[in-house]
From Swiss-Prot:
The protein's name: Tol-Pal system protein TolB
Self-association and partners: The Tol-Pal system is composed of five core proteins: the inner membrane proteins TolA, TolQ and TolR, the periplasmic protein TolB and the outer membrane protein Pal. They form a network linking the inner and outer membranes and the peptidoglycan layer.
GO biological process, one term: cell division
Name of the encoding gene: tolB
Gene3D superfamilies assigned to the protein according to its UniProt record, in alphabetical order: TolB, C-terminal domain, TolB, N-terminal domain
Keyword flag Lipoprotein: no
HAMAP family in the record: TolB
Signal sequence, start to end: 1-28
Region (Disordered): 288-310
Length: 435
Protein backbone atom coordinates (compact mmCIF):
# COMPACT_ATOMS: atom_id res chain seq x y z
CA UNK A 1 0.00 0.00 0.00
CA UNK A 2 1.33 3.46 -0.82
CA UNK A 3 1.77 6.09 1.84
CA UNK A 4 -1.05 8.09 0.32
CA UNK A 5 -3.56 5.24 0.29
CA UNK A 6 -2.64 4.38 3.89
CA UNK A 7 -4.06 7.70 5.05
CA UNK A 8 -6.55 8.59 2.33
CA UNK A 9 -8.33 5.45 1.27
CA UNK A 10 -11.01 6.31 -1.28
CA UNK A 11 -14.35 5.36 0.21
CA UNK A 12 -17.79 5.95 -1.25
CA UNK A 13 -20.72 5.34 1.08
CA UNK A 14 -24.27 4.72 -0.13
CA UNK A 15 -27.36 4.29 2.04
CA UNK A 16 -28.81 0.79 2.00
CA UNK A 17 -32.27 0.00 3.30
CA UNK A 18 -34.77 -2.79 2.81
CA UNK A 19 -37.88 -0.91 1.78
CA UNK A 20 -40.42 -3.53 2.81
CA UNK A 21 -39.08 -3.65 6.35
CA UNK A 22 -38.21 0.03 6.67
CA UNK A 23 -41.71 1.01 5.63
CA UNK A 24 -43.39 -0.84 8.49
CA UNK A 25 -44.79 1.22 11.38
CA UNK A 26 -41.88 2.58 13.37
CA UNK A 27 -41.32 0.86 16.68
CA UNK A 28 -38.94 2.02 19.40
CA UNK A 29 -35.51 0.94 18.15
CA UNK A 30 -32.84 -0.37 20.47
CA UNK A 31 -30.43 2.19 21.95
CA UNK A 32 -27.68 2.23 24.55
CA UNK A 33 -27.26 5.26 26.82
CA UNK A 34 -23.53 5.36 27.58
CA UNK A 35 -23.81 8.63 29.50
CA UNK A 36 -24.89 6.67 32.58
CA UNK A 37 -21.39 5.33 33.12
CA UNK A 38 -20.96 1.59 33.60
CA UNK A 39 -23.53 -0.14 31.39
CA UNK A 40 -24.33 -3.78 30.76
CA UNK A 41 -22.82 -4.82 27.39
CA UNK A 42 -25.51 -5.25 24.75
CA UNK A 43 -25.81 -8.74 23.19
CA UNK A 44 -25.28 -8.33 19.44
CA UNK A 45 -25.14 -10.95 16.68
CA UNK A 46 -22.53 -10.21 14.00
CA UNK A 47 -23.01 -12.78 11.25
CA UNK A 48 -20.34 -13.81 8.75
CA UNK A 49 -20.69 -11.54 5.73
CA UNK A 50 -21.17 -13.19 2.35
CA UNK A 51 -18.10 -13.26 0.06
CA UNK A 52 -14.51 -14.50 0.07
CA UNK A 53 -13.31 -12.20 2.86
CA UNK A 54 -16.72 -11.61 4.42
CA UNK A 55 -15.92 -13.63 7.54
CA UNK A 56 -12.73 -11.61 8.07
CA UNK A 57 -14.60 -8.31 7.79
CA UNK A 58 -17.27 -9.39 10.28
CA UNK A 59 -14.57 -10.66 12.64
CA UNK A 60 -12.96 -7.19 12.75
CA UNK A 61 -16.36 -5.56 13.30
CA UNK A 62 -17.16 -7.89 16.20
CA UNK A 63 -13.72 -7.37 17.74
CA UNK A 64 -14.10 -3.57 17.58
CA UNK A 65 -17.51 -3.67 19.24
CA UNK A 66 -16.40 -6.10 21.93
CA UNK A 67 -13.29 -4.08 22.77
CA UNK A 68 -15.44 -1.02 23.42
CA UNK A 69 -16.96 -2.82 26.40
CA UNK A 70 -20.45 -1.73 25.31
CA UNK A 71 -21.29 -4.77 23.20
CA UNK A 72 -21.17 -8.52 23.79
CA UNK A 73 -20.99 -10.35 20.44
CA UNK A 74 -22.93 -13.62 20.66
CA UNK A 75 -21.02 -16.82 19.90
CA UNK A 76 -21.86 -17.92 16.37
CA UNK A 77 -22.53 -21.47 17.52
CA UNK A 78 -25.72 -20.12 19.13
CA UNK A 79 -27.10 -18.78 15.84
CA UNK A 80 -30.28 -20.54 14.69
CA UNK A 81 -30.71 -18.88 11.30
CA UNK A 82 -27.94 -19.07 8.72
CA UNK A 83 -28.07 -15.87 6.68
CA UNK A 84 -27.98 -16.80 3.00
CA UNK A 85 -29.38 -13.58 1.55
CA UNK A 86 -28.27 -10.41 3.39
CA UNK A 87 -30.68 -8.34 1.26
CA UNK A 88 -33.71 -10.07 2.76
CA UNK A 89 -35.20 -9.52 6.19
CA UNK A 90 -33.97 -12.13 8.70
CA UNK A 91 -36.23 -14.40 10.70
CA UNK A 92 -36.50 -12.09 13.69
CA UNK A 93 -37.95 -14.74 16.01
CA UNK A 94 -34.77 -16.85 15.64
CA UNK A 95 -32.66 -13.94 16.84
CA UNK A 96 -35.01 -13.02 19.67
CA UNK A 97 -34.66 -16.57 21.01
CA UNK A 98 -30.91 -16.02 21.58
CA UNK A 99 -31.57 -12.50 22.96
CA UNK A 100 -29.80 -10.67 20.13
CA UNK A 101 -30.66 -7.05 20.85
CA UNK A 102 -29.12 -6.13 17.49
CA UNK A 103 -28.17 -8.10 14.39
CA UNK A 104 -25.55 -7.31 11.73
CA UNK A 105 -25.63 -8.87 8.25
CA UNK A 106 -23.66 -8.03 5.14
CA UNK A 107 -21.81 -8.91 1.99
CA UNK A 108 -18.35 -8.26 0.52
CA UNK A 109 -17.89 -8.57 -3.24
CA UNK A 110 -15.56 -7.44 -6.01
CA UNK A 111 -16.70 -5.07 -8.75
CA UNK A 112 -15.74 -5.40 -12.43
CA UNK A 113 -13.31 -2.49 -12.06
CA UNK A 114 -11.48 -4.27 -9.23
CA UNK A 115 -12.94 -2.23 -6.41
CA UNK A 116 -14.27 -3.85 -3.27
CA UNK A 117 -17.92 -3.39 -2.37
CA UNK A 118 -18.82 -3.92 1.27
CA UNK A 119 -22.39 -3.58 2.49
CA UNK A 120 -24.03 -4.09 5.84
CA UNK A 121 -27.43 -3.88 7.47
CA UNK A 122 -28.15 -3.37 11.16
CA UNK A 123 -31.39 -4.90 12.43
CA UNK A 124 -33.42 -4.67 15.62
CA UNK A 125 -34.96 -8.16 16.03
CA UNK A 126 -37.33 -7.12 18.82
CA UNK A 127 -38.71 -4.17 16.83
CA UNK A 128 -38.68 -6.24 13.63
CA UNK A 129 -36.99 -3.43 11.72
CA UNK A 130 -33.84 -2.47 9.91
CA UNK A 131 -32.07 0.32 11.79
CA UNK A 132 -29.58 1.40 9.15
CA UNK A 133 -27.60 0.12 6.20
CA UNK A 134 -24.79 1.30 3.95
CA UNK A 135 -22.50 0.10 1.21
CA UNK A 136 -18.92 1.20 0.58
CA UNK A 137 -16.70 1.08 -2.49
CA UNK A 138 -12.95 1.05 -2.00
CA UNK A 139 -9.72 -0.68 -2.99
CA UNK A 140 -9.30 -4.30 -1.80
CA UNK A 141 -6.32 -3.48 0.43
CA UNK A 142 -8.56 -1.20 2.53
CA UNK A 143 -10.88 -3.98 3.70
CA UNK A 144 -9.88 -3.64 7.36
CA UNK A 145 -10.61 0.07 7.27
CA UNK A 146 -14.07 -0.60 5.84
CA UNK A 147 -14.69 -2.99 8.73
CA UNK A 148 -13.72 -0.26 11.22
CA UNK A 149 -16.03 2.23 9.48
CA UNK A 150 -18.93 -0.22 9.68
CA UNK A 151 -18.22 -0.75 13.39
CA UNK A 152 -18.28 3.04 13.85
CA UNK A 153 -21.64 3.25 12.07
CA UNK A 154 -23.09 0.55 14.34
CA UNK A 155 -21.66 2.24 17.44
CA UNK A 156 -23.16 5.60 16.46
CA UNK A 157 -26.56 4.19 15.51
CA UNK A 158 -26.99 2.45 18.86
CA UNK A 159 -25.25 4.88 21.25
CA UNK A 160 -25.94 8.17 19.46
CA UNK A 161 -22.26 9.11 19.71
CA UNK A 162 -19.36 8.97 17.28
CA UNK A 163 -17.25 5.84 17.25
CA UNK A 164 -13.47 5.69 17.31
CA UNK A 165 -12.55 2.54 15.40
CA UNK A 166 -11.51 4.18 12.11
CA UNK A 167 -8.51 5.86 13.70
CA UNK A 168 -4.73 5.54 13.88
CA UNK A 169 -2.29 5.63 16.78
CA UNK A 170 1.26 6.90 16.52
CA UNK A 171 3.61 5.55 19.19
CA UNK A 172 7.21 4.74 20.05
CA UNK A 173 8.10 1.18 19.06
CA UNK A 174 10.74 -0.28 21.38
CA UNK A 175 12.85 -3.35 20.57
CA UNK A 176 16.13 -4.88 21.69
CA UNK A 177 17.55 -5.26 25.18
CA UNK A 178 17.24 -2.64 27.90
CA UNK A 179 20.92 -1.85 27.43
CA UNK A 180 20.57 -1.48 23.65
CA UNK A 181 16.98 -0.36 23.24
CA UNK A 182 15.97 0.74 19.74
CA UNK A 183 13.17 3.31 19.63
CA UNK A 184 11.34 4.05 16.40
CA UNK A 185 8.38 6.23 15.57
CA UNK A 186 5.57 3.93 14.42
CA UNK A 187 1.94 4.16 13.33
CA UNK A 188 -0.85 1.58 13.44
CA UNK A 189 -4.61 1.11 13.40
CA UNK A 190 -6.21 1.63 16.81
CA UNK A 191 -6.54 -2.15 17.27
CA UNK A 192 -2.80 -2.77 16.83
CA UNK A 193 -2.88 -3.93 13.20
CA UNK A 194 -1.10 -2.46 10.15
CA UNK A 195 1.97 -1.30 12.08
CA UNK A 196 4.41 0.74 10.01
CA UNK A 197 7.71 2.28 11.10
CA UNK A 198 8.20 5.99 10.41
CA UNK A 199 11.83 6.33 11.53
CA UNK A 200 14.79 3.96 11.29
CA UNK A 201 15.70 3.91 14.97
CA UNK A 202 19.07 5.60 14.59
CA UNK A 203 17.94 8.42 16.90
CA UNK A 204 15.96 8.38 20.15
CA UNK A 205 12.38 9.58 19.64
CA UNK A 206 9.79 10.59 22.25
CA UNK A 207 6.26 12.02 22.64
CA UNK A 208 4.78 11.86 19.12
CA UNK A 209 1.54 13.79 18.62
CA UNK A 210 -0.91 13.98 15.69
CA UNK A 211 -1.96 17.17 13.96
CA UNK A 212 -5.71 17.81 13.66
CA UNK A 213 -5.41 17.07 9.92
CA UNK A 214 -3.94 13.61 10.67
CA UNK A 215 -1.28 14.25 8.02
CA UNK A 216 1.49 15.48 10.33
CA UNK A 217 3.13 14.31 13.53
CA UNK A 218 5.24 16.38 15.87
CA UNK A 219 7.72 14.61 18.14
CA UNK A 220 10.98 14.99 20.04
CA UNK A 221 14.20 13.51 18.66
CA UNK A 222 17.81 13.40 19.79
CA UNK A 223 19.16 13.57 16.22
CA UNK A 224 22.78 14.75 16.19
CA UNK A 225 22.73 14.43 20.01
CA UNK A 226 20.67 17.62 20.19
CA UNK A 227 17.13 17.33 21.62
CA UNK A 228 14.75 19.04 19.22
CA UNK A 229 11.07 19.09 18.31
CA UNK A 230 10.43 17.88 14.76
CA UNK A 231 7.51 18.02 12.36
CA UNK A 232 7.01 14.93 10.16
CA UNK A 233 4.85 14.82 7.03
CA UNK A 234 3.31 11.35 7.08
CA UNK A 235 2.69 11.03 3.34
CA UNK A 236 6.10 12.21 2.16
CA UNK A 237 8.29 11.29 5.13
CA UNK A 238 9.77 14.80 5.07
CA UNK A 239 10.73 16.23 8.46
CA UNK A 240 11.87 19.60 9.72
CA UNK A 241 12.97 21.14 13.00
CA UNK A 242 10.34 23.26 14.76
CA UNK A 243 12.40 26.29 15.75
CA UNK A 244 16.10 26.63 16.44
CA UNK A 245 16.30 27.27 20.15
CA UNK A 246 19.46 27.37 22.29
CA UNK A 247 18.09 24.84 24.79
CA UNK A 248 16.27 21.51 24.70
CA UNK A 249 12.70 21.49 23.37
CA UNK A 250 10.25 18.73 24.29
CA UNK A 251 6.60 17.76 24.96
CA UNK A 252 5.24 19.17 21.68
CA UNK A 253 1.54 19.24 20.83
CA UNK A 254 -0.56 20.91 18.13
CA UNK A 255 -3.18 23.56 18.72
CA UNK A 256 -6.72 22.46 17.77
CA UNK A 257 -6.60 24.48 14.54
CA UNK A 258 -3.22 23.01 13.60
CA UNK A 259 -1.66 26.46 13.21
CA UNK A 260 0.61 26.30 16.25
CA UNK A 261 2.80 23.90 18.18
CA UNK A 262 2.97 24.30 21.94
CA UNK A 263 6.02 22.87 23.74
CA UNK A 264 8.49 23.21 26.59
CA UNK A 265 11.87 24.90 26.21
CA UNK A 266 14.56 24.15 28.76
CA UNK A 267 17.10 26.82 29.57
CA UNK A 268 19.50 26.34 32.48
CA UNK A 269 17.71 24.43 35.28
CA UNK A 270 14.16 25.41 34.43
CA UNK A 271 11.79 25.01 31.50
CA UNK A 272 8.91 27.14 30.29
CA UNK A 273 6.08 26.78 27.82
CA UNK A 274 6.19 28.39 24.40
CA UNK A 275 4.06 28.37 21.28
CA UNK A 276 5.32 28.60 17.72
CA UNK A 277 3.19 29.77 14.82
CA UNK A 278 3.91 27.25 12.06
CA UNK A 279 3.38 29.82 9.30
CA UNK A 280 5.34 32.80 10.57
CA UNK A 281 7.69 30.76 12.82
CA UNK A 282 7.25 33.36 15.54
CA UNK A 283 7.35 32.19 19.15
CA UNK A 284 5.41 33.33 22.19
CA UNK A 285 6.39 32.59 25.78
CA UNK A 286 3.46 31.59 27.98
CA UNK A 287 5.09 30.83 31.34
CA UNK A 288 8.02 32.46 33.09
CA UNK A 289 9.03 30.74 36.31
CA UNK A 290 12.11 29.25 37.94
CA UNK A 291 10.35 25.88 37.91
CA UNK A 292 9.89 23.11 35.35
CA UNK A 293 6.76 23.75 33.29
CA UNK A 294 6.03 21.01 30.76
CA UNK A 295 3.43 18.73 29.08
CA UNK A 296 1.12 21.45 27.73
CA UNK A 297 -2.22 20.46 26.19
CA UNK A 298 -4.87 22.69 24.62
CA UNK A 299 -8.56 22.52 25.41
CA UNK A 300 -10.53 21.51 22.29
CA UNK A 301 -11.67 25.09 21.69
CA UNK A 302 -8.09 26.35 21.94
CA UNK A 303 -9.00 28.84 24.67
CA UNK A 304 -7.11 27.21 27.55
CA UNK A 305 -4.03 25.11 28.21
CA UNK A 306 -3.37 22.50 30.87
CA UNK A 307 0.24 21.83 31.87
CA UNK A 308 2.47 20.26 34.49
CA UNK A 309 4.62 22.35 36.85
CA UNK A 310 6.69 21.73 39.97
CA UNK A 311 6.57 25.40 41.02
CA UNK A 312 4.84 24.32 44.25
CA UNK A 313 7.54 21.79 45.15
CA UNK A 314 6.36 18.71 43.25
CA UNK A 315 4.68 18.17 39.87
CA UNK A 316 1.05 19.28 39.79
CA UNK A 317 -1.48 20.16 37.09
CA UNK A 318 -2.20 23.77 36.23
CA UNK A 319 -4.59 25.44 33.79
CA UNK A 320 -4.11 28.80 32.09
CA UNK A 321 -5.63 30.85 29.30
CA UNK A 322 -4.12 30.36 25.85
CA UNK A 323 -2.21 33.65 26.18
CA UNK A 324 -0.54 32.51 29.43
CA UNK A 325 -2.75 34.50 31.80
CA UNK A 326 -4.74 33.11 34.71
CA UNK A 327 -2.39 30.29 35.70
CA UNK A 328 -4.22 28.20 38.31
CA UNK A 329 -3.37 24.95 40.06
CA UNK A 330 -6.16 22.34 39.85
CA UNK A 331 -4.65 19.14 41.38
CA UNK A 332 -4.53 18.83 45.17
CA UNK A 333 -4.58 15.11 45.93
CA UNK A 334 -1.81 13.07 47.51
CA UNK A 335 1.23 12.42 45.37
CA UNK A 336 2.35 14.15 42.19
CA UNK A 337 0.53 14.69 38.89
CA UNK A 338 1.92 14.75 35.35
CA UNK A 339 1.15 14.44 31.60
CA UNK A 340 -2.23 16.23 31.63
CA UNK A 341 -4.18 16.01 28.37
CA UNK A 342 -7.53 17.60 27.63
CA UNK A 343 -10.44 15.46 26.44
CA UNK A 344 -11.73 16.14 22.89
CA UNK A 345 -15.11 16.73 24.53
CA UNK A 346 -13.63 19.40 26.81
CA UNK A 347 -15.20 17.94 29.93
CA UNK A 348 -12.21 16.13 31.46
CA UNK A 349 -8.43 16.22 31.77
CA UNK A 350 -6.60 12.89 31.89
CA UNK A 351 -3.37 12.59 33.86
CA UNK A 352 -0.70 10.34 35.33
CA UNK A 353 -0.55 10.27 39.15
CA UNK A 354 2.32 8.95 41.23
CA UNK A 355 1.53 8.07 44.85
CA UNK A 356 2.42 5.26 47.22
CA UNK A 357 5.08 3.90 44.90
CA UNK A 358 2.58 3.29 42.09
CA UNK A 359 1.51 5.09 38.94
CA UNK A 360 -2.16 5.63 38.08
CA UNK A 361 -4.11 6.92 35.10
CA UNK A 362 -7.02 9.14 36.07
CA UNK A 363 -9.32 11.95 35.01
CA UNK A 364 -10.61 15.15 36.60
CA UNK A 365 -12.76 18.07 35.54
CA UNK A 366 -10.96 21.19 34.24
CA UNK A 367 -11.57 22.92 37.58
CA UNK A 368 -9.90 20.04 39.46
CA UNK A 369 -13.08 18.51 40.86
CA UNK A 370 -14.33 14.97 40.35
CA UNK A 371 -10.95 13.22 40.33
CA UNK A 372 -11.28 9.53 39.43
CA UNK A 373 -8.54 6.91 39.17
CA UNK A 374 -9.17 4.48 36.30
CA UNK A 375 -6.23 2.09 36.67
CA UNK A 376 -3.18 1.68 38.92
CA UNK A 377 0.00 -0.32 38.42
CA UNK A 378 3.75 -0.49 38.83
CA UNK A 379 4.25 2.11 36.10
CA UNK A 380 1.39 3.54 34.03
CA UNK A 381 1.97 6.70 32.01
CA UNK A 382 1.13 8.83 28.98
CA UNK A 383 -2.67 8.86 28.54
CA UNK A 384 -4.11 9.83 25.15
CA UNK A 385 -7.78 10.24 24.24
CA UNK A 386 -9.83 8.51 21.57
CA UNK A 387 -11.49 11.18 19.40
CA UNK A 388 -14.90 10.58 20.99
CA UNK A 389 -13.56 11.25 24.50
CA UNK A 390 -14.84 7.92 25.86
CA UNK A 391 -11.65 5.82 25.84
CA UNK A 392 -8.01 6.37 26.80
CA UNK A 393 -4.84 4.63 25.67
CA UNK A 394 -1.66 4.61 27.77
CA UNK A 395 1.48 2.57 28.26
CA UNK A 396 2.39 0.30 31.15
CA UNK A 397 5.73 -1.04 32.32
CA UNK A 398 5.03 -4.05 34.53
CA UNK A 399 7.44 -4.93 37.33
CA UNK A 400 10.20 -7.16 36.00
CA UNK A 401 8.94 -6.99 32.41
CA UNK A 402 11.19 -6.50 29.41
CA UNK A 403 9.49 -3.36 28.21
CA UNK A 404 6.33 -1.23 28.09
CA UNK A 405 3.06 -2.24 26.43
CA UNK A 406 0.05 -0.27 25.25
CA UNK A 407 -3.36 -0.55 26.92
CA UNK A 408 -6.76 1.04 26.47
CA UNK A 409 -9.35 1.73 29.15
CA UNK A 410 -12.78 3.35 29.12
CA UNK A 411 -14.04 5.98 31.53
CA UNK A 412 -15.69 3.40 33.79
CA UNK A 413 -12.27 1.93 34.59
CA UNK A 414 -13.64 -1.60 34.13
CA UNK A 415 -12.84 -2.23 30.47
CA UNK A 416 -9.05 -2.41 30.29
CA UNK A 417 -7.60 -4.00 27.14
CA UNK A 418 -4.08 -4.87 26.02
CA UNK A 419 -3.32 -3.40 22.59
CA UNK A 420 -1.09 -6.03 21.03
CA UNK A 421 1.87 -4.75 19.01
CA UNK A 422 4.78 -6.67 17.43
CA UNK A 423 7.26 -4.83 19.69
CA UNK A 424 7.14 -3.06 23.02
CA UNK A 425 5.32 0.27 22.80
CA UNK A 426 5.20 3.59 24.66
CA UNK A 427 4.05 7.22 24.24
CA UNK A 428 0.84 6.56 22.26
CA UNK A 429 -1.09 9.38 20.59
CA UNK A 430 -4.56 8.84 19.12
CA UNK A 431 -5.55 10.42 15.81
CA UNK A 432 -8.83 12.17 15.05
CA UNK A 433 -11.35 10.12 13.06
CA UNK A 434 -10.15 9.43 9.53
CA UNK A 435 -11.95 10.97 6.55
Amino acid sequence: MTKCSFFRAILVAVGLMTAAVFATPANALVTLDIRKGNVQPMPIAVTDFQGDIGAQVSQVIAADLQRSGLFAPINKTAFIEKISNPDAAPRFEDWKVINAQALVTGRVSKEADGRLRAEFRLWDPFAGQQMTGQQFYTQPENWRRVAHIIADAIYKQITGEEGYFDTRVVFVSESGTKQQRKRQLAIMDQDGFNVRMLTDGSDLVLTPRFSPSRQEVTYMSFANQQPRVYLLQLETGQREVVGNFPGMTFSPRFSPDGQKVIMSLQQDANSNIYTMDLRSRTTTRLTSTAAIDTSPSYSPDGARVSFESDRGGKPQIYVMNADGSGQTRISFGDGSYSTPVWSPRGDLIAFTKQAGGKFSIGVMKPDGSGERILTTGFHNEGPTWAPNGRVLMFFRQAAGSGGPQLYSIDLTGYNEQLVKTPTYGSDPAWSPLME
